[in-house]
Amino acid sequence: MKAAVHFLALAALMATGSTFASCDRNSDVSTESNVPVLDVKSEVTSFALGANLTGALPPSPPATPSEADMLTYMKEEEKLAKDVYTTLNAKWNVQIFTNIANAEATHINAVVGLMEHLGLSNTALLPVGEFQNPEFTILYNQLVAQGSISLAEAYKVGALIEDKDIFDVSTDMQNTSNASILLVFDNLKRASGNHLRAFTKQLTALGTTYTPQFIDQTTYAQIIATPMEQGKQYRKINGQ
């Protein structure tokens, strides 16, 4: 399992200073409909769950050991985002943290659904601020402390989390050929990009900026310059 050490170090340093991609379906177009799985509203990007997500996932082999580690880590990373945003909302009472925390809950459920689809059972979630990987517990405490300094620092914490999510998902997508993982992770990446745009917009309104710590500056600039991503719709056979 990948370490969160670099993420932890950056947090300490700071403290000191829609829809899914298409799946090919060989069926008559007259029997199909466009089905959204990634739901983009304003600055918040959620997964439409249940039958929509299940229908989008293609048949896939069971997860390999490395893919199991990848998914377990991503489940914890998405939970970190939700837990930090929930706690920072209690501190600052600003709508963006409420909205994005709710969106992150759907991201967690999407990863859990993916894990179950691939035959994994370690899908349990601990209470807010508690994680199976103790490094995430340490990181949660550091990020909450940093985000409690000021509203600007809270938005920078949000940007850092989304920055790391984009980097990790992009890396993971290069290390798997599993179609279901690629489908979900592509849209986690889109969602994190949308949330990074949202936090950057809030920072700009406060007259400050965020410097990316994981993705490179060129990638960050491209994300910020791009409109909110809606993704592609997949085709679902009516009645299924």
Question: Where do the protein language model's features map onto the residues?
Answer:
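Bacterial Sec-dependent N-terminal signal peptides
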Residues: 1-7, 13-57
